[in-house]
């Protein structure tokens, strides 16, 4: 494990010097920035005392506006006022145009097919729009904290892919902001509640925002969060509650929602009523429209009846996510509530009824993600108690396992920040194989012989199936202390075996540097050796499979056919001993052509045996 001390070049790290770092919740609807001050993580307000910044950017002829100012024009200048840009991150223009949702923007395609918004300020891409949202948040943080930032932790949805994550990092880098880490939003929420320290088990994060709903099922093990399943609805949120309540009020007052200007006023009043009903049982809705005043008393029961179906949809998504994760609701230790819409009493009561315990709600659900990100940022820049080392841990050399032919399959790449968990599936090589040996290695080379051996262990109790039929999931997990745990589990039976090792033990910085230099020096040679080894493994697999097939069904072949196949097998076995990968591939292809007829006969024979004794009606 590489332990990188955080300090200016030529200076020692000063434990007493507080380094400025922030956590940013770059949300679909709203964004926030938070920092740890005097030991407490808090969101930062702007000059007007507002903590939340609407994630809206307007590109007008006279300039660019962001947040509340841009929001004022979202209805009157929709074509140039970009909302929910997070939905466009990492997506191609073709994907957007193929979707069912229609947008008021004028799009063009970039050279690589990504969307460009055509605005009075010129063409801008989603990364640039996101940077404009980040800009006032960064400025707010530097003004409040009184100095330049050393970096930021930015949160992203757990389901974001590599392109979406990279786009988020690029947005920060456009502003010259160092991204300390991208943190999954549900993980940030769990960190805010301190669930990352000491507790182990399954955690659910229920995130109901203004426009989207997300449910994440996480497993926490020794400080590492593993995302087991995600789900939700990208078109369901608190705004839908407002629309239902606004429609109800319009109906009670005999108003037509199609009337110009009425819709926005109704939505504003509906939101006020919704928020008031979280604290009281009855609220009077009021509206002044076209010189007339309207009033109507609404109780919580009426509101609950209006939104009940939508809340049930979120619970159904929770049920699906648990099923995908293979978890029962009773196994969930804690449920974390995220998003302003989780303040609605019906939402909280339904979540409590489903999971069987009261959810965690003590931290403002609008701010919990930003607060968790701020805590993580504070740790990453080294703001720990004086007794602690100021360390940023990364994996200095890739971690992997040996596969057939002495090859290395890398599971965790070097320079990955820890804690981390990665998993990959493997299968058996021989028919009836009931055990599998695992060799854990470290290094950047392609062959095991050139890497560092860390540990060996064996998984026993694999069902005796045909080669390739068993599924063994291998999980590498590195905790915050650099301890590597490798677990192998056969999926159908659940039988497992594991081992722990400290990858950094006995490795000096010089040895790490030497291993990296060797990997670059021998890169071309290593690739050639890997290609040869892969062909040799494939040859062995083909021969093993054919030996098994002939042992069962050689009676299907004439003597001449059997001799031809045997000769081709002998040729492949001989060629595979050499060092010509292309020659081995050619021999495999010749043997494949030679056995086509045999494969067809075996298939016909299997079908005849399966149908033997079956009537037409049964079939």
From Swiss-Prot:
<dbReference type="GO" id="GO:0005524">
    <property type="term" value="F:ATP binding"/>
</dbReference>
<dbReference type="InterPro" id="IPR029048">
    <property type="entry name" value="HSP70_C_sf"/>
</dbReference>
<dbReference type="InterPro" id="IPR018181">
    <property type="entry name" value="Heat_shock_70_CS"/>
</dbReference>
<dbReference type="Pfam" id="PF00012">
    <property type="entry name" value="HSP70"/>
</dbReference>
<dbReference type="GO" id="GO:0016226">
    <property type="term" value="P:iron-sulfur cluster assembly"/>
</dbReference>
<dbReference type="InterPro" id="IPR029047">
    <property type="entry name" value="HSP70_peptide-bd_sf"/>
</dbReference>
<protein>
    <recommendedName>
        <fullName>Chaperone protein HscA homolog</fullName>
    </recommendedName>
</protein>
<dbReference type="GO" id="GO:0140662">
    <property type="term" value="F:ATP-dependent protein folding chaperone"/>
</dbReference>
<keyword id="KW-0547">Nucleotide-binding</keyword>
<comment type="function">
    <text>Chaperone involved in the maturation of iron-sulfur cluster-containing proteins. Has a low intrinsic ATPase activity which is markedly stimulated by HscB.</text>
</comment>
<keyword id="KW-0143">Chaperone</keyword>
<dbReference type="InterPro" id="IPR010236">
    <property type="entry name" value="ISC_FeS_clus_asmbl_HscA"/>
</dbReference>
<dbReference type="GO" id="GO:0051082">
    <property type="term" value="F:unfolded protein binding"/>
</dbReference>
<dbReference type="InterPro" id="IPR043129">
    <property type="entry name" value="ATPase_NBD"/>
</dbReference>
<comment type="similarity">
    <text>Belongs to the heat shock protein 70 family.</text>
</comment>
<keyword id="KW-0067">ATP-binding</keyword>
<dbReference type="InterPro" id="IPR013126">
    <property type="entry name" value="Hsp_70_fam"/>
</dbReference>
<dbReference type="GO" id="GO:0016887">
    <property type="term" value="F:ATP hydrolysis activity"/>
</dbReference>
<dbReference type="InterPro" id="IPR042039">
    <property type="entry name" value="HscA_NBD"/>
</dbReference>
């Amino acid at each position: 494990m590489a332990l990188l001390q955080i300090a200016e070049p030529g200076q020692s790290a000063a434990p007493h010097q507080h380094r400025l770092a922030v956590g940013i919740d770059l949300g679909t609807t709203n964004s926030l920035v938070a920092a740890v001050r005097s030991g407490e993580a808090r969101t930062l307000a702007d000059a007007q005392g507002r903590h939340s910044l609407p994630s809206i950017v307007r590109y007008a002829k006279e300039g660019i506006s962001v947040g509340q100012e841009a929001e004022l024009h979202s209805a009157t200048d929709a074509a140039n006022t970009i909302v929910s840009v997070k939905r466009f991150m990492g997506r191609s223009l073709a994907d957007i145009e193929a979707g069912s949702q229609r947008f008021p923007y004028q799009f063009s395609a970039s050279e690589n097919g990504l969307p460009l918004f055509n605005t009075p300020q010129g063409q801008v891409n989603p990364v640039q729009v996101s940077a404009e949202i980040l800009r006032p948040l960064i400025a707010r943080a530097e003004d409040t904290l009184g100095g330049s930032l050393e970096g930021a932790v930015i949160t992203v949805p757990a389901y974001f892919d590599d392109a979406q994550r990279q786009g988020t990092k690029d947005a920060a880098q456009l502003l010259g902001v160092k991204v300390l880490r991208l943190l999954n939003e549900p993980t940030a929420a769990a960190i805010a509640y301190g669930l990352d320290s000491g507790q182990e088990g399954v955690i659910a994060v229920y995130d109901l925002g203004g426009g989207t709903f997300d449910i994440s099922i996480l497993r926490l093990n020794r400080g590492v969060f593993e995302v087991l399943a995600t789900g939700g609805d990208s078109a369901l949120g608190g705004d839908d509650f407002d629309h239902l309540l606004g429609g109800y009020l319009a109906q009670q007052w005999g108003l037509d929602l199609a009337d110009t200007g009425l819709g926005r006023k109704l939505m504003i009043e509906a939101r006020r009523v919704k928020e008031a009903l979280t604290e009281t049982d009855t609220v009077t809705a009021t509206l002044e429209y076209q010189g007339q005043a309207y009033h109507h008393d609404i109780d919580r029961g009426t509101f609950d009846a209006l939104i009940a179906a939508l809340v049930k949809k979120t619970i159904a998504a929770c049920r699906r996510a648990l099923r995908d994760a293979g978890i029962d609701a009773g196994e969930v230790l804690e449920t974390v509530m995220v998003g302003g819409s989780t303040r609605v009493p019906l939402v909280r009561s339904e979540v409590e009824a489903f999971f069987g315990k009261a959810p965690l709600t003590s931290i403002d659900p609008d701010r919990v993600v930003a607060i968790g990100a701020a805590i993580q940022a504070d740790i990453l820049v080294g703001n720990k108690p004086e007794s602690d080392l100021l360390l940023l841990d990364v994996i200095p050399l890739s971690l992997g396992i040996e596969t057939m032919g002495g090859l290395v399959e890398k599971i965790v790449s070097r320079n990955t920040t820890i804690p981390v968990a990665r998993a990959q599936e493997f299968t058996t090589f021989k028919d009836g194989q009931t055990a599998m040996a695992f060799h854990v290695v470290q290094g950047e080379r392609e062959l095991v012989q050139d890497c560092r051996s860390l540990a060996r262990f064996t998984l026993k109790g694999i069902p005796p199936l045909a080669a390739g039929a068993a599924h063994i999931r291998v999980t590498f997990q590195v905790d915050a202390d650099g301890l590597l745990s490798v677990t192998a589990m056969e999926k159908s039976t659940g039988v497992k075996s594991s081992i722990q090792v400290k990858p950094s033990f006995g490795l000096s910085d010089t040895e790490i540097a030497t291993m990296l230099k060797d990997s670059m020096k021998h890169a071309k040679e290593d690739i050639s050796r890997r290609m040869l080894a892969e062909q040799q493994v494939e040859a062995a697999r083909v021969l093993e499979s054919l030996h098994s097939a002939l042992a069962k069904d050689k009676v299907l072949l004439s003597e001449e056919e059997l001799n031809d196949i045997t000769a081709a097998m002998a040729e492949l076995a001989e060629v595979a001993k050499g060092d010509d990968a292309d020659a081995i591939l050619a021999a495999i292809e010749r043997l494949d052509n030679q056995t086509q007829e045999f494969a067809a006969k075996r298939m016909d024979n299997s079908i005849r045996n399966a149908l033997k004794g079956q009537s037409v009606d049964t079939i």
